[in-house]
Amino acid sequence: MAAPDLSTNLQEEATCAICLDYFTDPVMTDCGHNFCRECIRRCWGQPEGPYACPECREVSAQRNLRPNRPLAKMAEMARRLHPPSPVPQGVCAAHREPLTTFCGDDLSLLCPTCERSEHWAHRVRPLQEAADDLKGRLEKSLEHLRKQMEDAMLFQAQAEETCALWQKMVESQRQNVLGEFERLRRLLAEEEQQLLQKLEEEELEVLPRLREGAARLGQQSTQLAALVSELESRCQLPALGLLQDIKDALCRVQDVKLQPPAVVPMELRTVCRVPGLVETLRRFRGDITLDPDTANPELVLSEDRRSVQRGEQRQALPDSPERFDPGPCVLGQERITSGRHYWEVEVGDQTSWALGVCKETVNRKEKGELSAGNGFWILVFLGSFYNSNERAFSPLRDPPKRVGIFLDYEAGHLSFYSATDGSLLFIFPETPFSGTLRPLFSPLSSSPTPMTICRLIGVSGDTLGPQ
C-alpha cells in the first residue's frame, strides 16, 4: 500500500488549495503555504495590503511571493503520472463543483468556491437571469453582425466585380500594346522596304551613268595615250621621217576633244528617316547645361548656361587645367558613366559647328586630331558637308536647324539626328566606352545666333525647345 499512498501524497502536495488543480507557476507566501501565482493574485485582488493567506489566514503587510521551482517540477511530475480527468459540463474546472452563478465583471461561470474566493467583490447573478440579459445583448449583436455580414458580402461582390473589370482592362491594354507594336513593326518594315527600294532605284539611276562616264573616260585616256606615244616617237625621227604624213598627225591632234563626265550630285535623295524615332529617343532626354570652367576664352556663355557663341574678342579667364585652349570647345556639366542619354542642340543657321562627346581625361591644351583614339567622338559640320575622323558621310540637302544626339553607354552607340524631321545624320561604329564621358559643344564659326541646348517645355514634357 506504500506506493498508492506515495502517489496520493504526491497529488495532494502538487495541488493548489485555491484552484484544486496541479500547481501552475507555484509561489510561496511568507507563512510557507504555496499557491498558483495567478490564483493568489486573483485571491488577494486589492493592490494594497494587508494580505491574508487563504489557507492559514496569517496576515502580511507586503505582497511577498517567492517562486517555488522544486514544487513546479513536482506538479509537472504529478501531472504526468495522474493527468487530470476531463471536467464534466456544468462543473468548475478549478474546484470540481457545480457552476451555479455568473460573474458580470469577468463574464465567467462560477461555482460556490469561486464566488466566495476571488469573485467575492464582483457582480454575481443567477445563471438564468444572466442568460436572459446576455441573450438580449447577443440578439442586438446578431442584428449588427448580420448587417455587417450583408455589407461584407456586398463589398466582396463589388471587389470581385472590380477585380474582373481590372483583369479585363489589363487584358484589353495588353492587346492594345501588342497590336500597336505589331502595327509599328509592320509600318517600320514597310518603311524600311520603301527606303531600300528608293535607294536601289537611285543606285540603278545614277550608278550606270557614273560607270558609263568612267568607261568613256577610260576609252579617251587610251586613245590619248596612244596619240601621245605616237607623237613622242615621231619627235625622235630624223627630219624626213618626222615630216612624212605630218598633216594627218596634226589633224588628229586638233580633233582631240576631251569630253568631261556628266555632273552627278553627290547628295543622296534617299535619307534614313525612321518614323517616330526622335519621339522615342526623347524618353531618354536629360537636362544638360554648360560648364563655364571648361569654356575656351573665345566662347561666350549665357547666364542660364544653355547657350554658347563665339565672342568678338578673347576673354581674360583663369587658365585652369579644365579649360579648352586653343580649341573652341565647352563641355556639359553632366558626367556620363552608364545608361542611355539624349539631348538636342539648336544650331540655327551656323555655318560650322561640332557636337558629340569626349572623355573626361582628354588633353585640352594642345591642338590635335579630335578622334576616337584621342577620346573624342564628334560630328563636324563645315557649311556644305559633314565629316568625322572615323569616316566621311554625305550631307543632307538641307542642313538641320536642330541636332539630336543619342548615347547608349553600355551598347557603345552614338548617333546624330536631325531633330526636325528625324533623319539620321551620322552614326559612329560600335565603340566600347569606358570611363567618364562629357557632352561637347563647339561653335566653329561666329554667328549672331548662339548654339543652344534645348530644354523641356511645359510639365507634360514631350516637347523640347531652345528656351
UniProtKB/Swiss-Prot annotation:
Residues 127-207 form a coiled coil. Residues 304-325 are annotated as: Disordered. Zn(2+) binds at residues 92, 95, 114, 119. Its EC number is 2.3.2.27. It comes from the Eukaryota. It catalyses: S-ubiquitinyl-[E2 ubiquitin-conjugating enzyme]-L-cysteine + [acceptor protein]-L-lysine = [E2 ubiquitin-conjugating enzyme]-L-cysteine + N(6)-ubiquitinyl-[acceptor protein]-L-lysine. Residues 304-313 have a biased composition (Basic and acidic residues). It is found in: Cytoplasm; Nucleus. A zinc finger (RING-type) spans 16-57. Autoubiquitinated upon DNA stimulation; autoubiquitination promotes interaction with SQSTM1/p62 and recruitment of AIM2 to autophagosomes. E3 ubiquitin-protein ligase that promotes the degradation of insoluble ubiquitinated proteins, including insoluble PAX6, poly-Gln repeat expanded HTT and poly-Ala repeat expanded ARX. Mediates PAX6 ubiquitination leading to proteasomal degradation, thereby modulating cortical neurogenesis. May also inhibit PAX6 transcriptional activity, possibly in part by preventing the binding of PAX6 to its consensus sequences. May contribute to the regulation of the intracellular level of HN (humanin) or HN-containing proteins through the proteasomal degradation pathway. This is E3 ubiquitin-protein ligase TRIM11. It comes from Rattus norvegicus (Rat). The gene is Trim11.
